[in-house]
Amino acid sequence: MKDSFLIKRGRFTPFAVIAMILLPTVTGILCMCFGRMKLPVSDVINSICSIFTGEIDNLQVYSVVVNLRLPRILMAIIVGAGLTCAGDTFQSLFSNPLATPDILGVTSGTCVGAILAIILSCSILETQLIALVFGLVSVFFTLKIAGKNNSGSMVYLVLAGVIASSLFNAIGSLLKYTADPQDKLPEITYWLMGSFTSATYKKLIVGSPLILIGIAIIFLLRWRLNILSLSEDEAKSSG
Protein backbone atom coordinates (compact mmCIF):
# COMPACT_ATOMS: atom_id res chain seq x y z
CA MET A 1 0.00 0.00 0.00
CA LYS A 2 1.41 3.37 -1.01
CA ASP A 3 1.86 6.00 1.67
CA SER A 4 -0.38 9.07 1.57
CA PHE A 5 -1.35 11.93 3.85
CA LEU A 6 -3.97 9.59 5.38
CA ILE A 7 -1.96 6.37 5.74
CA LYS A 8 1.77 5.93 6.30
CA ARG A 9 3.47 2.58 6.85
CA GLY A 10 0.10 0.88 7.10
CA ARG A 11 -1.15 3.18 9.88
CA PHE A 12 -3.48 6.16 9.96
CA THR A 13 -1.80 9.53 10.26
CA PRO A 14 -2.85 11.98 13.02
CA PHE A 15 -4.68 14.00 10.37
CA ALA A 16 -6.73 10.94 9.39
CA VAL A 17 -7.61 10.17 13.02
CA ILE A 18 -8.71 13.76 13.67
CA ALA A 19 -10.74 13.79 10.45
CA MET A 20 -12.50 10.52 11.37
CA ILE A 21 -13.50 12.05 14.71
CA LEU A 22 -14.50 15.49 13.44
CA LEU A 23 -16.48 14.44 10.36
CA PRO A 24 -19.16 12.36 12.14
CA THR A 25 -19.27 14.88 15.00
CA VAL A 26 -19.87 17.87 12.73
CA THR A 27 -22.26 15.92 10.52
CA GLY A 28 -24.23 14.75 13.56
CA ILE A 29 -24.55 18.28 14.94
CA LEU A 30 -25.73 19.59 11.56
CA CYS A 31 -28.28 16.78 11.24
CA MET A 32 -29.72 17.67 14.64
CA CYS A 33 -30.45 21.16 13.31
CA PHE A 34 -32.94 19.89 10.72
CA GLY A 35 -36.40 18.44 11.14
CA ARG A 36 -39.92 19.69 11.75
CA MET A 37 -38.41 22.11 14.23
CA LYS A 38 -35.36 23.77 12.68
CA LEU A 39 -32.73 24.83 15.18
CA PRO A 40 -29.57 26.94 14.92
CA VAL A 41 -26.25 25.22 15.56
CA SER A 42 -25.71 27.27 18.72
CA ASP A 43 -28.93 25.93 20.29
CA VAL A 44 -27.94 22.36 19.48
CA ILE A 45 -24.48 22.77 21.01
CA ASN A 46 -25.92 24.49 24.09
CA SER A 47 -28.43 21.67 24.57
CA ILE A 48 -25.69 19.05 24.37
CA CYS A 49 -23.54 21.01 26.82
CA SER A 50 -26.54 21.21 29.17
CA ILE A 51 -26.27 17.44 29.65
CA PHE A 52 -23.00 17.98 31.51
CA THR A 53 -23.66 21.38 33.10
CA GLY A 54 -27.30 20.85 34.09
CA GLU A 55 -28.20 24.40 33.01
CA ILE A 56 -31.15 24.28 30.59
CA ASP A 57 -31.97 27.55 28.80
CA ASN A 58 -34.90 26.29 26.70
CA LEU A 59 -36.68 23.14 27.86
CA GLN A 60 -38.43 22.57 24.53
CA VAL A 61 -35.23 22.79 22.50
CA TYR A 62 -33.41 20.62 25.05
CA SER A 63 -36.12 17.96 24.83
CA VAL A 64 -36.04 17.89 21.02
CA VAL A 65 -32.25 17.71 20.79
CA VAL A 66 -31.37 15.46 23.73
CA ASN A 67 -34.41 13.19 23.96
CA LEU A 68 -35.31 12.81 20.27
CA ARG A 69 -32.51 13.65 17.84
CA LEU A 70 -29.37 12.76 19.80
CA PRO A 71 -30.23 9.06 20.33
CA ARG A 72 -31.11 8.76 16.63
CA ILE A 73 -27.77 10.26 15.60
CA LEU A 74 -25.81 8.06 18.01
CA MET A 75 -27.62 4.94 16.83
CA ALA A 76 -27.04 5.86 13.18
CA ILE A 77 -23.30 6.28 13.83
CA ILE A 78 -22.98 2.98 15.71
CA VAL A 79 -25.06 1.02 13.20
CA GLY A 80 -23.11 2.54 10.31
CA ALA A 81 -19.82 1.54 11.92
CA GLY A 82 -21.11 -1.99 12.47
CA LEU A 83 -22.30 -2.36 8.87
CA THR A 84 -18.97 -1.06 7.57
CA CYS A 85 -16.97 -3.55 9.63
CA ALA A 86 -19.32 -6.40 8.70
CA GLY A 87 -19.05 -5.70 4.98
CA ASP A 88 -15.27 -5.36 5.08
CA THR A 89 -14.94 -8.56 7.12
CA PHE A 90 -17.04 -10.54 4.65
CA GLN A 91 -14.90 -9.34 1.77
CA SER A 92 -11.71 -10.28 3.62
CA LEU A 93 -12.93 -13.71 4.72
CA PHE A 94 -14.05 -14.73 1.25
CA SER A 95 -11.36 -12.78 -0.67
CA ASN A 96 -14.08 -11.36 -2.86
CA PRO A 97 -15.28 -7.75 -3.14
CA LEU A 98 -18.73 -9.11 -4.05
CA ALA A 99 -19.06 -11.02 -0.77
CA THR A 100 -21.47 -8.80 1.12
CA PRO A 101 -24.10 -9.78 3.71
CA ASP A 102 -26.78 -9.20 1.07
CA ILE A 103 -25.30 -11.55 -1.50
CA LEU A 104 -24.43 -14.31 0.98
CA GLY A 105 -27.95 -14.43 2.37
CA VAL A 106 -27.12 -13.04 5.81
CA THR A 107 -29.49 -10.10 5.47
CA SER A 108 -32.41 -12.33 4.51
CA GLY A 109 -31.63 -14.72 7.35
CA THR A 110 -31.53 -11.99 9.98
CA CYS A 111 -34.79 -10.55 8.63
CA VAL A 112 -36.51 -13.91 9.09
CA GLY A 113 -35.20 -14.12 12.65
CA ALA A 114 -36.38 -10.61 13.45
CA ILE A 115 -39.82 -11.19 11.91
CA LEU A 116 -40.25 -14.37 13.95
CA ALA A 117 -39.15 -12.60 17.14
CA ILE A 118 -41.56 -9.70 16.56
CA ILE A 119 -44.46 -12.08 15.92
CA LEU A 120 -43.62 -13.86 19.19
CA SER A 121 -43.54 -10.46 21.01
CA CYS A 122 -39.92 -10.87 22.10
CA SER A 123 -37.96 -8.09 23.79
CA ILE A 124 -35.45 -5.87 22.00
CA LEU A 125 -32.46 -7.95 23.12
CA GLU A 126 -34.18 -11.23 22.27
CA THR A 127 -35.08 -9.91 18.82
CA GLN A 128 -31.46 -8.97 18.13
CA LEU A 129 -30.12 -12.31 19.37
CA ILE A 130 -32.65 -14.32 17.35
CA ALA A 131 -31.83 -12.26 14.25
CA LEU A 132 -28.12 -12.93 14.86
CA VAL A 133 -28.71 -16.68 15.18
CA PHE A 134 -30.72 -16.81 11.96
CA GLY A 135 -28.01 -14.80 10.20
CA LEU A 136 -25.40 -17.36 11.26
CA VAL A 137 -27.69 -20.18 10.13
CA SER A 138 -27.93 -18.50 6.74
CA VAL A 139 -24.12 -18.31 6.50
CA PHE A 140 -23.72 -22.01 7.34
CA PHE A 141 -26.46 -22.89 4.87
CA THR A 142 -24.72 -20.91 2.13
CA LEU A 143 -21.33 -22.48 2.89
CA LYS A 144 -22.89 -25.94 2.95
CA ILE A 145 -24.38 -25.49 -0.50
CA ALA A 146 -21.18 -23.96 -1.91
CA GLY A 147 -19.12 -26.75 -0.31
CA LYS A 148 -20.82 -29.31 -2.52
CA ASN A 149 -18.62 -28.05 -5.33
CA ASN A 150 -15.00 -29.14 -5.08
CA SER A 151 -13.60 -26.41 -7.28
CA GLY A 152 -13.77 -23.82 -4.51
CA SER A 153 -14.77 -21.11 -6.95
CA MET A 154 -16.20 -17.96 -5.42
CA VAL A 155 -18.82 -17.99 -8.15
CA TYR A 156 -20.46 -20.98 -6.49
CA LEU A 157 -20.38 -19.18 -3.15
CA VAL A 158 -22.24 -16.21 -4.61
CA LEU A 159 -24.75 -18.51 -6.32
CA ALA A 160 -25.28 -20.37 -3.04
CA GLY A 161 -25.91 -17.03 -1.36
CA VAL A 162 -28.54 -16.18 -3.96
CA ILE A 163 -30.25 -19.51 -3.24
CA ALA A 164 -30.15 -18.87 0.51
CA SER A 165 -31.51 -15.34 0.04
CA SER A 166 -34.40 -16.59 -2.08
CA LEU A 167 -35.26 -19.28 0.46
CA PHE A 168 -35.19 -16.97 3.48
CA ASN A 169 -37.07 -14.24 1.59
CA ALA A 170 -39.83 -16.76 0.89
CA ILE A 171 -39.94 -17.78 4.56
CA GLY A 172 -40.03 -14.12 5.58
CA SER A 173 -42.94 -13.41 3.22
CA LEU A 174 -44.86 -16.36 4.66
CA LEU A 175 -44.28 -15.14 8.22
CA LYS A 176 -45.42 -11.62 7.32
CA TYR A 177 -48.58 -13.09 5.79
CA THR A 178 -49.42 -14.72 9.13
CA ALA A 179 -48.64 -11.58 11.19
CA ASP A 180 -51.35 -9.38 12.69
CA PRO A 181 -51.91 -6.58 10.10
CA GLN A 182 -52.95 -4.08 12.77
CA ASP A 183 -50.16 -4.60 15.28
CA LYS A 184 -47.26 -6.81 14.23
CA LEU A 185 -47.06 -6.13 10.49
CA PRO A 186 -46.37 -2.36 10.84
CA GLU A 187 -43.70 -3.12 13.44
CA ILE A 188 -42.10 -5.66 11.11
CA THR A 189 -42.17 -3.17 8.23
CA TYR A 190 -40.51 -0.45 10.29
CA TRP A 191 -37.85 -2.90 11.47
CA LEU A 192 -37.07 -4.08 7.93
CA MET A 193 -36.89 -0.49 6.68
CA GLY A 194 -34.24 0.24 9.29
CA SER A 195 -35.91 3.35 10.67
CA PHE A 196 -34.20 5.21 13.52
CA THR A 197 -37.42 6.99 14.47
CA SER A 198 -37.96 4.86 17.56
CA ALA A 199 -34.35 5.13 18.73
CA THR A 200 -34.06 5.63 22.48
CA TYR A 201 -31.26 5.54 25.03
CA LYS A 202 -32.62 2.22 26.30
CA LYS A 203 -32.24 0.65 22.87
CA LEU A 204 -28.76 2.15 22.60
CA ILE A 205 -27.75 0.58 25.90
CA VAL A 206 -29.09 -2.80 24.78
CA GLY A 207 -27.80 -2.87 21.21
CA SER A 208 -24.59 -0.83 21.26
CA PRO A 209 -22.50 -3.27 23.36
CA LEU A 210 -23.15 -6.09 20.87
CA ILE A 211 -22.03 -3.95 17.94
CA LEU A 212 -19.04 -2.43 19.75
CA ILE A 213 -17.83 -5.83 20.98
CA GLY A 214 -18.02 -7.15 17.42
CA ILE A 215 -16.08 -4.13 16.12
CA ALA A 216 -13.44 -4.61 18.84
CA ILE A 217 -13.00 -8.29 17.92
CA ILE A 218 -12.66 -7.42 14.24
CA PHE A 219 -10.11 -4.73 15.12
CA LEU A 220 -8.01 -7.21 17.11
CA LEU A 221 -8.08 -9.66 14.20
CA ARG A 222 -7.46 -7.03 11.52
CA TRP A 223 -4.00 -8.34 10.53
CA ARG A 224 -5.32 -11.88 10.06
CA LEU A 225 -8.18 -10.53 7.98
CA ASN A 226 -5.68 -8.67 5.81
CA ILE A 227 -3.84 -11.95 5.18
CA LEU A 228 -7.10 -13.71 4.31
CA SER A 229 -7.89 -11.04 1.73
CA LEU A 230 -4.65 -11.82 -0.13
CA SER A 231 -4.25 -14.46 -2.78
CA GLU A 232 -2.56 -17.75 -1.86
CA ASP A 233 0.78 -16.74 -3.39
CA GLU A 234 0.74 -13.32 -1.71
CA ALA A 235 -0.11 -14.88 1.65
CA LYS A 236 2.76 -17.38 1.39
CA SER A 237 5.23 -14.64 0.48
CA SER A 238 4.06 -12.67 3.54
CA GLY A 239 4.83 -15.62 5.81
What are these regions (language model features)?
Residues M1-S238:
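Alpha-helical transmembrane segments in inner-membrane proteins
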